[in-house]
Amino acid sequence: MTDALKRLSKEGVAIWLDDLSRKRITSGNLAELIDQQHVVGVTTNPSIFQKAISQGDGYDQQVSDLAARRVTVEEAIRMITTADVRDAADILRPVFDATDGQDGRVSIEVDPRLAHNTKATVAEAKQLAWLVDRPNTLIKIPATKAGIPAITEVIGLGISVNVTLIFSLERYRMVMDAYLAGLEKAKERGLDLSKIHSVASFFVSRVDTEIDKRIDALGTPEAKAARGKAGLANARLAYEAYEAVFSTDRWLALDKAQANKQRPLWASTGVKDPAYKDTMYVEELVAPNTVNTMPEATLEATADHGEIRGNTIAGTYEQARADLDAVEKLGIAYDDVVQLLEEEGVDKFEASWNDLLKSTEAELQRLAPSEG
């Protein structure tokens, strides 16, 4: 066991857990991770909830109660997931208070079937914020074309947001612009900007997985030399964009009004390829005012053998551009890759949501009271 997680925190990287389940809450495991592993936040998504509810037995009593009330399957899912998020938020509340609202956050995602519907996404975000009813909740909105204006509207209402499924630098700049526009709306409405927070979830390993697959298909030595570089390069250039946007006059005017910067959050940080070190997306993306949300396996690997070498983003931008250029020169189109990943990301979450509907419906039927 190393002190890597402690050192990571000291470098300004907030450690969040990319997982949540009823068992993790009731067993005391989440509280233990907060106390012992420097975890200061939690992210969830439809895939996480689908796995938790379909595999765990910690939900039987609540599902039985919901079945007795004859609620719809959609109502049941909302009741179950918001209960978990509410309980996790309560456990993290001391962290939230100690960090003035920056950390101690729990994220819950809007229905992924609404990813291409701005109006419905805004309505869903408002409903989720009301249902969870905790100040340390972040509502996750996907960075689709329809999601961008939804971000502005929801931030403008004073609701804190985790923008998810960001793969491209262009889309990330749109996300930051949407956040600033939302803050400007909130300011016009007289809202307290210091209470509004946001993170932008920039996905890392999926970029390498897709590009490496195309590199392997080429099979040349030049192609192989580019393996495992695009994901980090993309994320590092995202941090460069973050530094640029949050030093503009537009931002400084909001800063004077006590607004908070939208922190970059490194998502999809579990290493998929065994050829790479299992802590690569933690060790190589260390910079101030960032978040790294980790699956438990990555968290444990970092605690066990992580090597934190200080800031590993500063001074990398020129090399990062060269790494992405090398991929383009191989005939692998960056724009095609990131567009595909966004579409697949939405599709995966939607598939998980549909699986969640089916498994929850089956549980409602199994635990329904007998007639008579």
From Swiss-Prot:
Annotated catalysed reactions: D-sedoheptulose 7-phosphate + D-glyceraldehyde 3-phosphate = D-erythrose 4-phosphate + beta-D-fructose 6-phosphate
A GO-annotated cellular component: cytoplasm
GO terms classed as biological process: carbohydrate metabolic process; pentose-phosphate shunt
Superkingdom of the organism of origin: Bacteria
Active-site annotation: K140 (schiff-base intermediate with substrate)
Keywords from the UniProt entry: Cytoplasm, Pentose shunt, Schiff base, Transferase
Compartment(s): Cytoplasm
UniProt pathway annotation: Carbohydrate degradation; pentose phosphate pathway; D-glyceraldehyde 3-phosphate and beta-D-fructose 6-phosphate from D-ribose 5-phosphate and D-xylulose 5-phosphate (non-oxidative stage): step 2/3
UniProt xrefs under SUPFAM superfamilies: Aldolase
Chief location: cytoplasm
GO molecular function: transaldolase activity
UniProt key word Cytoplasm: yes
The keyword Transferase appears for this protein: yes
EC number(s) reported in the record: 2.2.1.2
Function (record text): Transaldolase is important for the balance of metabolites in the pentose-phosphate pathway.
Family: Belongs to the transaldolase family. Type 2 subfamily.
Protein name in the entry: Transaldolase 2
Species whose genome carries this gene: Streptomyces avermitilis (strain ATCC 31267 / DSM 46492 / JCM 5070 / NBRC 14893 / NCIMB 12804 / NRRL 8165 / MA-4680)
Gene designation per UniProt: tal2
